Design a protein with these regions (language model features):
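C-terminal alpha-helix plus adjacent terminal tail
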Residues: 1-69, 75-83, 89, 97-99, ...
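Hydrophobic, secondary-structure "cap" segments at the distal end of domains
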Residues: 170-185, 404-418
Length: 523
């Protein structure tokens, strides 16, 4: 069982230090502390356990240290920044493990960029040694990259020539979309296993800054302070992220039917102010929902249908949204909305079918209504008294999907009708407005939902994953959707091809002294 909750005192691979407005995240991987047996994390390589710590450390910076305005990511190893994902771990892993691992690392890198874009937290990658594969992809997520010019240090994306796979954590996409590396040079770079040294890396726009070893530490410190000047994070008292209570988000797994109920609770009484506490309802909700999604993804692979339910009073949930809107400029509100945004985005790209179920006790209001719009279908009981759906301003911009669109807009494929905001919408009216898939009465509701569930879980999980990913994101694309929809999709295909994972595939024979044997047919 994989757990995604951890604390800094339990870290094995990252060191977190603070100096005024600058935090330093130092990667110093413990070779013998991999998450699974059978491999050593040599050369500052990482596995899922390393990235779970990074995910936690980033949230500690966001919530416990509002005084931090810039973050330096560097290495504690001599001449080695990071060699990327551990190759032997990948070779030993199942296809599902590799896919889930890459998705989580992608989301963590996207989260770095999200914090820079929305929260004013700036990131500087300080490459103080060789940087390869996923190590460079981690640097690519930062706002700026500095590299030491010591005649040894290189940057590379060697996956294609060495392993027969892709740099699957955004590397191919970011060098052209974000770094604006010329396409032919990107082609050369991605097929050159040895990579390039500092001067050429700067010339090709692979890095931003170059400094000699004697000046590197001083340069990094100065540049981190300069980046901090660009931030509007206010400082002040932070919020200690205490252990999760798992009170607001309840998960009930039914392995026999391959379904899971995720029930999200509105507060019994909405908070009246912004409380600097991990128990503050919006923050507690975001943390618990994020953990529940990750737990289901990684520990319940055959549970293919998530039933999204809510409980509570809509009026209390509306008060929560009003509080978030009123105090939108407060640092804790901004960070909490950010965590909710990233968590809901995690829901969007989960390879599970999702049905929203509006029964008599439902509370799909405001922020909680986002769950209904994230679902592939929604079933709403038409009864008196019965459930309602209530929209707030939050549904029209607070929680954009990874493509920048709102879920309401995606639901209507960009053609959003005039919708009531702030007032309860009955099942019949929701059906008329096209807000829900179906609104059966109390005689047919349970039967219709049951049949829909049984039908869904009988279909090919592979076909459903591809179908859902294609239908959920309408309209415009951006770098993030190209990472998930193109790079990741191709990587997942390559991960099951014999040229990578067959008996003589490049990923399988890496490090054995044998040469890969390819099927030369282009598909």
């Amino acid at each position: 069982m994989i757990r995604f909750e951890t604390q800094p005192e339990n870290y094995s691979h990252w060191k977190l230090a603070f100096d005024g407005p600058v935090a330093t995240l130092t990667l110093d991987v413990a070779e013998d502390k991999g998450l699974a047996p059978g491999y050593k994390l040599k050369l500052n390589s990482y596995d899922l356990g390393v990235d779970i710590e990074l995910h936690d450390a980033l949230n500690r910076i966001r919530f416990e240290h509002p005084e931090v305005k810039s973050v330096v990511m560097t290495s504690g190893k001599s001449r080695m920044f990071c060699s990327g994902a551990n190759i032997y771990m990948l070779g030993l892993s199942t296809h599902a493990w590799k896919v889930n691992f890459c998705k989580f690392t992608n989301e963590t890198r996207n989260g770095i960029e999200d914090s820079s874009r929305y929260s004013g937290l700036k990131f500087l990658a300080a490459l103080n040694g060789t940087t390869a594969g996923g190590g460079y992809e981690m640097a690519l997520a930062c706002d700026e990259i500095a590299i030491v010019d010591d005649r040894f240090t290189t940057v590379s994306l060697p996956e294609v020539p060495l392993l027969g796979v892709l740099p699957g954590t955004g590397g191919l996409t970011r060098i052209v979309d974000k770094r604006k590396v010329r396409r032919d040079l990107a082609d050369v770079f991605c097929t050159t296993a040895e990579g390039v040294r500092a001067d050429r890396a700067k010339e090709w726009k692979l890095v931003d800054h170059v400094a000699k070893p004697q000046q590197f530490a001083e340069f990094v410190q100065k540049r981190a302070l300069d980046l901090a000047q660009q931030s509007d994070r206010p400082g002040g008292q932070g919020v200690k992220l205490t252990p999760l209570k798992r009170e607001l988000v309840k998960v009930k797994v039914d392995a026999a039917t391959r379904t899971a109920e995720i029930t999200v609770h509105a507060p019994e009484k909405a908070p009246e102010s912004v409380d600097l506490s991990a128990d503050w309802y919006p923050l507690q909700l975001a943390r618990e929902l994020d953990d529940a999604i990750l737990d289901l993804r990684h520990n319940h692979l055959e549970v293919g249908l998530w039933l999204l339910k809510t409980r509570g009073k809509a009026e209390e949930m509306l008060k929560v949204d009003a509080l978030l809107e009123k105090h939108a400029s407060h640092w804790l509100v901004r960070e909490t909305v950010g965590l909710l945004r990233r968590t809901l985005a995690r829901l969007d790209v989960s390879s599970r079918s999702m049905f929203a179920v509006f029964d008599g006790e439902s509370c799909f209001a405001g922020t909680l209504a986002e769950l209904a719009f994230a679902a592939d279908r929604s079933y709403m009981l038409d009864a008196e008294p019965g459930p309602s759906l209530t929209l707030t301003k939050a549904n029209f911009g607070s929680y954009p999907m990874v493509n920048g669109d709102t879920r309401v807009s995606a639901h209507y494929c960009g053609e959003v009708p005039e919708l009531p905001v702030g007032s309860a919408i009955s099942a019949r009216r929701a059906d008329e407005l096209g807000l829900v898939t179906s609104a059966p009465d109390d005689i047919d509701f349970e039967e219709e939902v049951r049949i829909a569930i049984e039908e869904r879980v009988s279909l090919s999980p592979d076909a459903l994953t591809g179908m859902e990913a294609s239908l959920r994101f309408t309209g415009k694309e951006n770098m993030a959707t190209r990472v998930f929809g193109r790079l990741t999709a191709w990587q997942n295909w390559i991960f099951i091809r014999p040229n990578a994972v067959g008996e003589h595939g490049a990923l399988k024979v890496y490090g054995t002294g044998s040469k890969a044997k390819f099927n030369w047919e282009r598909v």
